[in-house]
Amino acid sequence: MRQEHKKLLRLVITALLVALVFCGSKIEVVLPLSVGGYSRFHLGNIMCALSGILLGPWWGGLAAGLGSALYDCTNVLYITEAPITFVTKGLYGVIAGAVFVAVFRRKATYPAMAVSTVCAAVSYIIIYLAKTFFYNSMLLEGMSASAAWVATVLKVPSSLFNGGVAIVLAPLLAFAVLRALRMARLDDALNPSEK
């Protein structure tokens, strides 16, 4: 495959993953909370990890961040957080991709992809809960530290669920997609150096 075709295919796959992250974030169940507003279960984190595994840290992070930020821009509950979401969800893809590329050398096995997703999910949960405590609860809503702590703790179950689902499903999807791309001889576009 010529270099121009590889670049174009990588761009197309990146755009497709932006759309999948967006759609995965739309598939949600919003839960009202007694303190701190709301929480939600969604499938966006699966696609963020998938983006990092398939595209590597930089392109995968871009797809994860952009798809998630676009979702935030379409929802009045989250529109003000779109720039923060771009960074935090982008980091989800960057971490999944960095672990998969640097540690596992893109070895397409379920354990390698699962460990990459675990690292990304745990990192994201910590970042998300810290953002919830400091930014959402204390800064925006003016809560005391104890009320902010309660609001943050109420978001732990949905965060763990979203992370757990991503840990199970993202590697399975990545394995299937990589296999299909390999059979179609299109996997070359995913493996060039991160330029």
Features from the language model and the residues they span:
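Loop-helix junctions at membrane interfaces
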Residues: M1-K195
